[in-house]
Swiss-Prot record:
Pathway membership, UniProt: Metabolic intermediate biosynthesis; chorismate biosynthesis; chorismate from D-erythrose 4-phosphate and phosphoenolpyruvate: step 2/7
InterPro entries, alphabetized: Dehydroquinate_synthase, DHQ_synth_AroB, DHQ_synth_fam, DHQS/DOIS_N, DHQS_C
Protein name: 3-dehydroquinate synthase
Family stated for the protein in its record: Belongs to the sugar phosphate cyclases superfamily. Dehydroquinate synthase family.
Record's subcellular location: Cytoplasm
Keywords from the UniProt entry: Amino-acid biosynthesis, Aromatic amino acid biosynthesis, Cobalt, Cytoplasm, Lyase, Metal-binding, NAD, Nucleotide-binding, Zinc
One Gene Ontology biological process: aromatic amino acid family biosynthetic process
Amino acid sequence: MIELVTDSPHPIHLVDSLQNPKLFASLSTDFPLIFITNTKLNTLILPPLLDLARSLGFSVETLTIPEGEETKTGDTFLSLHQQLTDLNVPRQATLIGVGGGVILDIAGFVAATHCRGMPFIAIPTTLVAMIDASIGGKNGINLNHIKNRIGSFYLPKAVWICPRKLSFLPQQELHHGIAECIKHAYIADSAILPLLQDPNALKKEDKLSLLIKKNCLCKASVVQQDVRDYAKRQILNFGHTLGHALEMLFIGKIPHSCAISVGMVLETKLSLSLGVARSPAILHSLIQDLLRYQLPVSLKDLYMRAQIPPHNCDQILSALTYDKKKQNTPLPPFVMIEEIGLAASFDGRFCQTISKHILTKVLEEEFYAMHNN
């Protein structure tokens, strides 16, 4: 089965198996396929895919990098370029990224820049990659722990999503992807939330596939209205402004999803402080939805998980100044929620600059609660 979920802003296919020759039908055997993956997936998922490609007449090469966010660096990026150069790969070759968000970010950036652009196919193997990282063409690498400081917009030729590959993941890893599902529900599509009410239901393939499909459609719909991230696509940054600042400070001690979960809670508190959110019930609902999947909802939760001494308010404010969305203002703009399923439009900007005083107040209340509860 190959189901076209959407073809805009690029084709996204939901498949029941990657061992389907029809997936490769649009590719020419005149040019090689270059698979980029990590060392673990190179033995776990890739071999049958390589065998199929070879049986169809393709010449294939595999480039592997270590696992983890710490791999998302300029050194890794340049090493992959050097390997492609050593292989003398033509620009008509297709790069295929197989992995989670880190792999797809790096592989997509390499595809965008090698020989000024090569065809790229994404095969996401984590939930967060299936519903988020593989969609929309954003790619890049970190610089000095600053998230995605260097990167580009480069739409893939296709995305192939096989939900069955999630069976390789521990439940905790699956829950990490739920954070992005919850984000989509709160910014644009509240109809996603009923699919998340029973974590056990997601053990069923049909329920999980439906969740993936709805989230792909949600993100694709937002992106196709604003591919270059000047207006509505900004809403996908909900939770990520403070979340990325926290990731920068924690330096690999917490998963991306945990930082984003707390970021969403704090940014919803900002929405309430400024009178943008229409009811405190939004915050209560968000916290319950995150807790259902054992995701953190406070700074205290993060520090307990990371087992490191707390930072202070000034350190978080300083980290925010490196946010790539920051303009000629002390702080970057924030996405805010009006009601569940609706991000505030702010006259078409979809994000709002706030005063340092307001943010400091929210953060200080969070630190006070952490030290006194």
